[in-house]
Amino acid sequence: MPKTIVEDNIDILVAGAGLGGTGAAFEARYWGQKKKIVIAEKANIDRSGAVAQGLYAINCYMGTRFGENNPEDHVRYARMDLMGMVREDLLFDMARHVDSTVHQFEEWGLPIMRDPKSGTYMREGRWQIMIHGESYKPIVAEAAKKSADKVFNRICVTHLLMDDAKENRVAGAVGFNVRTGDYHVFKSKAVIVAAGGASNIFRPNSVGEGAGRVWYAPWSSGSAYGLMIEAGAKMTQMENRIVLARFKDGYGPVGAYFLHLKTYTQNCNGEEYESKWFPALTKMVGKEYLDTEGQHLSHKPIPTCLRNHALISEVNAGRGPIHMVTMEAFQDPHLEEIGWHNFLGMTVGQAVLW
């Protein structure tokens, strides 16, 4: 018979223990040495969240200590890639903290690849650094477990509790154990919502069995949005959705393949297809965001959404599926080894396919 369990006198409750929640717990302990910190996670903290099965790159690292980039550079890049739909203050605030976070991960034992000549972190693109990330989440989870007074695994937080005495103030949260059905009540002075985003808002090309293997994490059910909106929180940047190009039967990330291994895409006829759609896209969005004549001179990236638009347009024109060509890169045994490691560290099924 399910029972009710009450956890009282919490100073800081962290709802969700993916990479964001684990980091929040560590920071909470750093700044609040004597506070009671509790984590509630709907899976198991060691392998939960978007990087649960590993990740082979950290996709944002300034490299300020190596003289590579500054936070201002990243704001300009993101503003371009997202076609102006950004909060620059939030971007800058994230960018100025990201390097110290990466250095912290390395101190905890995360293996980060280095350039053997320069000694700097190995880049796969301007912003991405390459890691051996199959144990990414367990490493960060260990720091969170040491920081928290209690960790409740298998607890799905469903609602935030509002304070009757103070308007617009959260006083805790409730949820249930997904294994036993036990009802949990957490009474807390503050709640950090680090629950998942929302995957599968759009129907993926992956259907049937593949629907559960899409990337981003299929278990991201919109909890972070639902909890906050119902409690009356102000939401910002909600109009920005990350939509990533994925390829037939692969599902997983391809950043290292494009940026480091220099692979490229083609349609079902073996043709390069992106450039044929660029003139029409330039008319649609203007030369500020897509100038095929001057893009290489300004070093501006072509916005991701426009690349996606070209891919979707090509498929709709009957020339899909779109493939990623790996044969040329894999003529180099060293690059082939990197390709294998890349997928085995985060998307094993993709390594078998490609």
Report each predicted region and the residues it spans:
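Conserved N-terminal glycine/acidic-rich loop preference
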Residues: 1-9, 15-22, 44-62, 90, ...
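Core beta-strand elements of the Rossmann-like FAD/NAD(P) dinucleotide-binding domain
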Residues: 7-10, 179-190
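N-terminal Rossmann-like FAD-binding beta1-loop-alpha1 element of flavoenzymes
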Residues: 12-39
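Short, well-ordered coil/turn residues at beta-beta hairpins
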Residues: 16, 188-190, 194-195, 268
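Conserved N-terminal glycine-rich FAD pyrophosphate-binding loop of Rossmann-like flavoproteins
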Residues: 43-76, 211, 253-257, 261
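Conserved FAD-binding subdomain of flavin-dependent enzymes
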Residues: 45, 63-111, 230-237
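Mobile, glycine/GP-rich and aromatic-enriched active-site lid/loop segments adjacent to catalytic centers
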Residues: 99, 106-159, 163-169, 239-354
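Glycine-rich loop(s) and the adjacent beta-strand/alpha-helix scaffold that form part
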Residues: 193-253
